[in-house]
Regions:
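Catalytic beta-strand/loop module used to bind and position nucleotide/cofactor moieties
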Residues: 1-2, 6-133
């Protein structure tokens, strides 16, 4: 149920971590948009947050994606994860990214039940489009 993408990118040509994180956010947000999910990133909370799905606003934003990177000698490690259809009960046992008072969601919980292959096709297209270094 959770799609995790580890990107090992040489950032030596463009040594700008904020730009790199913004690209990871854009890939996530644009992928979700293809499935009629409106999501955003927030300056005060790490991750990708759903505000609207299938033309319905959520009462409170829910986290659908995480971003975690490590940089060593300007080579990126780790990357993003997006919740397609995981068992959300496991998330009740943890404090995702150390953020309290917010729930975690998935495409499936939002009423979008797709095969991982379909999700992967869209995600890969967005990575190819935006990950230009």
């Amino acid at each position: 149920g959770q799609r995790v993408v580890y990107l090992m990118i040489n950032l030596n040509k463009k040594k700008d971590l904020r730009y790199f994180v913004s690209i990871l956010e854009k890939i996530s947000i644009e992928t979700l948009k293809e499935f009629n999910i409106v999501s955003v990133s927030r300056n005060d909370r790490i991750g990708i947050w759903v505000t609207k799905s299938n033309n319905k606003y959520l009462k409170k934003e829910k986290k659908i994606g995480a971003i975690g990177i490590r940089i060593k000698k300007w080579i990126s490690f780790h990357g993003i994860s997006l919740n397609v259809k995981p068992d959300l009960n496991y998330f009740k046992q943890i404090n995702a990214c150390g953020i309290k008072n917010f729930e975690v969601t998935s495409l499936k919980e939002l009423g979008i039940d797709i095969k991982m292959e379909e999700f992967d096709k869209v995600l890969l297209a967005k990575i190819k489009k935006y990950m230009v270094f």
